[in-house]
């Protein structure tokens, strides 16, 4: 006689709300949040983010990047004043603006770095200053759980 294994699919949601004061400049002009994704265990994974620059000047923008965690040291050491990005860094997501509301679906299981960057760019003649940034991150995914695992938790 075969035992029947019942599997349930449970949705998971994690939300965080943060406010960052990000100084200007290439040395320290960024905030990095790390997250890991295992697409075998976490299917239909999505990272939703809602970003708003709260600085007083109209047109203040922030750069948003998502790269692999293993590329962070190369990115940090890159002097960005020439406006280019290192060729050996794969950008999984790149955008800039005063308000950004978007969703990232990772293509592979990896450890990722979510970067808010206030580094200078040569093509931008504006004076860079510290920016206050509101960020809401929402991680959502589904996971298969054996019913026996649920019973053991209760």
Segments predicted by a language model, with ranges:
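Acidic, Ser/Thr/Pro
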Residues: 1-154
């Amino acid at each position: 006689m075969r035992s029947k294994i019942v599997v349930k699919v449970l949705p998971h949601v994690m939300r965080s709300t943060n406010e960052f004061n990000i100084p200007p400049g290439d040395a320290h002009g960024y905030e990095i949040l790390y997250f890991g994704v295992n697409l075998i265990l976490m299917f239909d994974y999505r990272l939703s983010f809602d970003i708003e620059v709260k600085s007083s000047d109209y047109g203040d923008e922030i750069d948003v990047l998502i790269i692999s965690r293993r590329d962070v040291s190369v990115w940090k050491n890159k002097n960005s004043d020439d406006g280019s990005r290192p060729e050996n860094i794969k950008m999984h997501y790149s955008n800039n603006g005063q308000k950004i509301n978007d969703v990232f679906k990772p293509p592979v299981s990896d450890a990722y770095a979510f970067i808010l960057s206030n580094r200078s760019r040569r093509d931008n003649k504006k004076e860079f200053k510290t920016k206050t940034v509101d960020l809401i991150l929402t991680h959502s995914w589904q996971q298969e759980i054996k019913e026996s695992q649920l019973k053991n938790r209760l």
